[in-house]
Regions:
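Glycine-rich flexible loops
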Residues: 1-130
Length: 130
């Protein structure tokens, strides 16, 4: 992606950022990086990272459009009361990262098939093959 941080006014609808983030979801689906559920990408749109765009709940990566992305304020305690509230795990993970790491402009969280299997094993170490 070619986005560069830009400070915008609150009345800006972040069109370019929405387009580029939506494209990243579709590319993830196209390259099979969309397995399982509870996968989320978010993009900070203000300087301190507290306002960010995130994918809506229960929409497949291949179907996400720029207009589907939800604008969230990481400092708003009423986020989960909204009718378009994000998945609670997305809110907890991405909200925390954007609040505490403003330099993390884009956060991508997925559960690739083999990584999920490996993480589910009693002994998830993967020793080198000689």
């Amino acid at each position: 992606m070619t986005s560069q941080l830009r400070v915008v006014s609150d009345d800006d609808n972040y069109t370019q950022q929405r387009v580029e983030l939506a494209a990243s979801f579709r590319w993830a689906a196209r390259t099979d990086l969309h397995e399982a559920v509870a996968n989320h990408f978010s993009l900070a749109v203000n300087e301190d990272g507290t306002k960010f765009l995130i994918n809506p709940n229960q929409v497949h990566f291949s179907q996400i459009k720029a207009s589907d992305l939800v604008l969230i304020d990481a400092n708003d305690p009423h986020t989960m009361d909204r009718p378009d509230a994000p998945d609670p795990t997305a809110w907890g993970l991405h909200g925390g990262i954007h609040r505490h790491c403003p330099h993390a402009r884009c956060v991508m969280h997925a559960h690739p098939e083999y990584g999920t299997v490996l993480a589910s094993l009693k002994d998830s170490r993967l020793p080198p093959i000689d």
